[in-house]
């Protein structure tokens, strides 16, 4: 159960908040998950929505990379909602079911393909030590270049922000398959 009242109807908001609610509904198809808490601050919700739109739909990174990164970040941050939501998104983006199981089980980077392991290591170092080693930095930099590395870092930050919101307020509206629950 959520720790604060969740905003599920636009009528619960003042006029400016209703516009943000509508924009979220239009861009995402539904107003759920972190938006149920973020809408207590419509301006924050709107700015978060814009960042998320760039990360998810406009980034120069391959969609599969974005969804895999989101999935690893959600799992490493033990964020039930983002994990559940992105299992489906990752599958649709082409992340293999076995890879999703490895992320779910928090298996070592060596159990992933080389390209997956690079992202797993990068996300885990950022989330757990708040820094990346020189070798991880160089690997990611060599693969994605400056712009791509900035976008990958921002993707991790975006999903960390959502995880903080969801985990703080206990907002969970998505459910993963039974064998992938966290």
Language-model features and meaning:
Residues 1-182:
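Hydrophobic alpha-helical segments
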């Amino acid at each position: 159960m959520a720790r604060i009242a969740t905003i599920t109807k636009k009528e619960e908001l003042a006029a400016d908040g209703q516009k943000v609610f509508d924009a979220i509904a239009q861009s995402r198809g539904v107003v759920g998950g972190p938006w149920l808490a973020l809408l207590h601050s419509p301006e924050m919700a709107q700015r978060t929505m814009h960042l998320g739109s760039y990360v998810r739909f406009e980034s120069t990174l391959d969609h599969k990379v974005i969804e895999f990164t989101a999935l690893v970040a959600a799992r490493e941050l033990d964020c039930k909602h983002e994990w559940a939501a992105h299992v489906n998104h990752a599958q649709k983006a082409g992340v293999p079911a076995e890879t999703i199981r490895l992320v779910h089980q928090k298996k070592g980077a060596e159990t992933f393909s080389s390209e997956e392991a690079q992202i797993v290591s990068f996300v885990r170092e950022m989330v757990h030590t708040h820094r990346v080693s020189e070798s991880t930095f160089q690997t990611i930099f060599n693969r994605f270049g400056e712009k791509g590395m900035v976008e990958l870092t921002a993707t991790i930050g975006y999903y960390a922000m959502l995880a903080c919101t969801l985990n703080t307020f206990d907002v969970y509206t998505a459910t993963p398959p039974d064998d992938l629950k966290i």
